[in-house]
Amino acid sequence: MGFDLDEDILQDFLVEAGEILELLQEQLVELENNPDDANLLNAIFRGFHTVKGGAGFLSLTELVDACHGAENVFDILRTGKRRVTAELMDVILQALDAVNAMFADVQNREPLTPADPAIIEALHRLSMPESEDEQAHHAAAEPEPEAEISMEEFDAV
């Protein structure tokens, strides 16, 4: 990548994307505790979308690819076609690490090191609606709630 771009545009990107990436880190930690928070899912989606847009404007293709993959995962999450799982969080955190590493490359005016292709592939897979097999696996992993009984039934026991 040539850094002969307008330095003002690059500086604007570095400031805005830097703030968004810091916020994304905090939001992902919060998501682990609140995986069904629609506002949070939308905010994370917008964060990756905004960084992707700025990176695209600057022709930072490798950064665009990683952000686009994460953005697609959050698009499917916010439409309810997939649920947040431990595996999904691991992949998203790895993707954010790759995005942060590329962001550091941009800050240092160095060529970008693309994300591991396995991360991009995992993002692509996780951006598809949850399969019936995955749904069955999640259902089996969740314990059945204990039945509630009335006081009359309890007294009868």
Regions flagged by a language model, labelled:
Residues 1-157:
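Non-catalytic helical tethers at domain boundaries
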